[in-house]
A protein has these predicted regions:
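Conserved beta-strand hairpin/beta-sheet module of binuclear metal-dependent hydrolase folds
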Residues: 1-48, 156-168
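Short, electropositive alpha-helical surface patch
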Residues: 217-234
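A short helix->loop->beta-strand "cap" motif at the edges of active sites that frequently abuts
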Residues: 25, 76-79, 203
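Short acidic-hydrophobic surface loop/beta-edge motif
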Residues: 20, 133-137
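Metallo-beta-lactamase
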Residues: 33-35, 141-148, 152-222
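Residue-level marker for buried hydrophobic side chains located in beta-strands
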Residues: 27-29, 57, 81, 164-166, ...
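C-terminal regulatory/interaction regions
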Residues: 236-288
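Active-site HxH/HxHxD metal-binding segment of metal-dependent hydrolases
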Residues: 37-38, 45-130, 134
């Protein structure tokens, strides 16, 4: 992509960790789980060789995106971690780290990993950022855009010169084809506002969480359909609530629509059950 390579560093399909490299400066976009962190670091080493990893860009504070950074720091102690100011505060909370530990260990066990060191206390943010801040990463320049909705701390990174957006789950989780899974966990209205903000930008390519770099056709499809995907899901949930359906029934309907193919590979069932239950309560609160 015009001098920039984007490479998949994941070692588990549920991970989200992608390397952006222009041959001079290397950036890791999200870092994946804690229990896979060392393996992700080894994948990076296999690509960079003796070169250093310059930056870690974190889109939000969830364990499957951010926890791996603590492990990667063991391999690359000079790397600069960039995350939203809100996320930087979350990393200081003992309760948040305890939740990360529990969720990471639970999924690790499902993947056959039962014994590994938890490094949550080593989470850090070197460069806390807010809307409009600019990160000059060598010759690559990224502007920060706040994208709340999935979490309060969700952000995106825009390289305007390349028309490249490093996206957030607030916009939806994409399977690369025709399915965009809504994922608003703190605010439906904020998610829609974030989507509308992105639609106004000149975006040619998207690096999508849990998927990777989209080609131009995929990018256009995603930009054209991300809003309707979130709105349609909200309206279906609202109708189900008004029809008297239980949360379990609504979750089952949601999974019947979205939990297939690639999405099923990257989205554990207990996670989609939990997240959909949260979305149901958001819709109940915001739209009823």
């Amino acid at each position: 992509m015009n001098g920039i390579k984007v490479m998949d560093m994941r070692c588990n399909k549920g991970d989200s960790a992608f390397l952006i490299d222009d041959g001079i400066t290397a950036i890791l976009y999200d870092t994946g789980f804690g229990f896979t962190g060392f393996e992700v670091a080894k994948n990076i080493q296999a690509v960079l060789g003796e070169r250093k990893l310059d930056y870690i860009f974190l889109t939000h504070s969830h364990y499957d995106h951010a926890l791996g950074s603590a492990y990667i720091l063991r391999y690359y102690p000079t790397v600069k971690v960039v995350a939203g100011s809100y996320a930087a505060g979350i990393f200081q909370r003992e309760g948040a780290k305890r939740t990360m530990r529990e969720m990471d260990a639970k999924f690790a066990e499902k993947c056959g990993v039962n014994d590994y060191q938890f490094l949550g206390d080593e989470l850090k943010v070197d460069i806390p950022v807010n809307e409009g801040d600019v990160i000059q990463a060598g010759d690559m320049c990224f502007e920060i855009i706040d994208l709340p909705g999935h979490t309060r701390c969700s952000i995106g990174f825009i390289c305007k010169e390349k028309g490249l957006l490093l996206s957030s789950e607030t916009l939806g989780v994409y399977d690369g084809e025709k399915r965009i899974v809504p994922s608003y966990l703190v605010s439906y209205s904020d998610a829609v506002s974030s989507i509308e903000k992105v639609k106004k930008l000149d975006i040619k390519r998207i690096l999508a969480p849990h998927y990777g770099i989209l080609n131009e056709e995929q990018t256009k499809y995603f930009l054209d359909n991300m809003k309707s995907a979130s709105e349609n899901a909200a309206h279906k949930i609202l109708k189900s609530l008004k029809d008297g359906k239980s949360s379990d029934e609504i979750i089952s309907d949601f999974k019947a629509e979205f939990w297939h193919g690639y999405i099923k590979e990257i989205y554990p069932e207990d996670a989609i059950d939990l997240n959909t239950s949260i979305m149901i309560e958001l819709i109940r609160k915001e739209l009823m």
